[in-house]
């Protein structure tokens, strides 16, 4: 395969990334069609995927995607929550059309739908979860590229990239590596400079899934740090004794209860009027 070429050989750095994100760990079940990609079975059950064959299939998938003249004709689909962030980043960097979340039935076959699309290539994260998209692609003759685990069925899948497609970090790394290889084949980046776009290095963790609760905690902590960093300005003390002028004694102005009051006249002593 092309993975043996010197310019596209699997580097030690990429191997370390695959091992760090556990992209080589498959499930405990094994499909007979995936047996050719399994290196060995671990003592506690999981199947170990051969990372060399993963790399070869990844390069084949990247060449198929890069061969599409219009990048928007490549539709990427994933209903798995862990892959949706990676899906959006992949579409933004490669120009593909992203469909994340629930795949509407008839999106590829029903022409009267508003979401109807006519792709030339379909890329998915899991053939089990995205089975509706795979079925409709087979009806209209659209090739399908998928990340597959050791238990995934390869029926209706044209190119399967063996990897751990259920891990939060592993699926993000696979989308990142696929986007990098596509951009290298298109000539937008080089293998020597790395994954650098517009002067910014695109790291693999940009494609990783982020828990909304953890993001909220980080934002809350950042606001608390900003509030503590702001200095509290205490009000200036004013010394009233230094001001000029005489200070009146308010107590002297209050009326006392012992003050003399005007006596009222008694009505009985008033003279009576005899002449009506």
Curated annotation (Swiss-Prot):
Record GO terms (molecular function): structural constituent of ribosome
Record bears the keyword Ribonucleoprotein: yes
PROSITE patterns registered for this protein in UniProt: RIBOSOMAL_S2_1, RIBOSOMAL_S2_2
Localization annotation: Cytoplasm
NCBIfam families (UniProt xref): uS2_euk_arch (TIGR01012)
Gene3D superfamilies: Glucose-6-phosphate isomerase like protein, domain 1
Record protein name field: Small ribosomal subunit protein uS2
Keywords in alphabetical order: Acetylation, Cytoplasm, Ribonucleoprotein, Ribosomal protein
Subunit structure, interactors included: Component of the small ribosomal subunit. Mature ribosomes consist of a small (40S) and a large (60S) subunit. The 40S subunit contains about 33 different proteins and 1 molecule of RNA (18S). The 60S subunit contains about 49 different proteins and 3 molecules of RNA (28S, 5.8S and 5S). Interacts with rps-21.
Family: Belongs to the universal ribosomal protein uS2 family.
One Gene Ontology cellular component: cytosolic small ribosomal subunit
Domain of life: Eukaryota
């Amino acid at each position: 395969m092309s993975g043996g070429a010197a310019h596209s050989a699997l580097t030690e750095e990429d191997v370390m990334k695959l091992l760090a994100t556990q992209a080589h760990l498959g499930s405990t079940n094994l499909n007979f069609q995936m047996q050719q990609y399994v290196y060995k079975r671990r003592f506690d059950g999981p199947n170990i995927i051969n990372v060399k064959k993963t790399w070869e299939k990844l390069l084949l998938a990247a060449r198929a995607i890069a061969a599409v003249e219009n990048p928007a004709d490549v539709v990427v689909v994933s209903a798995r929550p862990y892959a949706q962030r990676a899906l959006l980043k992949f579409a933004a960097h490669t120009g593909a059309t992203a469909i994340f979340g629930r795949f509407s039935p008839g999106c590829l076959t029903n022409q009267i739908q508003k979401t109807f699309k006519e792709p030339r290539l379909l890329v998915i994260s899991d053939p089990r979860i995205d089975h509706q998209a795979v079925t409709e692609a087979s009806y209209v003759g659209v090739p399908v590229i998928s990340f597959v685990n050791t238990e995934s069925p390869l029926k209706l899948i044209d190119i399967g990239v063996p990897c751990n497609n259920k891990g939060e970090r592993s699926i993000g790394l696979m989308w990142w590596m696929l986007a990098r290889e596509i951009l290298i084949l298109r000539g937008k980046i080089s293998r020597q400079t790395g994954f650098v776009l517009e002067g910014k290095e695109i790291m693999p963790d940009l494609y990783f899934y982020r828990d909304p609760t953890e993001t909220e905690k980080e934002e809350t902590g950042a606001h608390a740090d900003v509030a503590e960093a702001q200095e509290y300005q205490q009000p200036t003390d004013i010394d009233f004794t230094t001001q000029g002028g005489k200070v009146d004694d308010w107590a002297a102005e209050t009326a006392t209860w012992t003050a003399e009051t005007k006596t009222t006249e008694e009505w009985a002593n008033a003279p009576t009027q005899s002449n009506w």
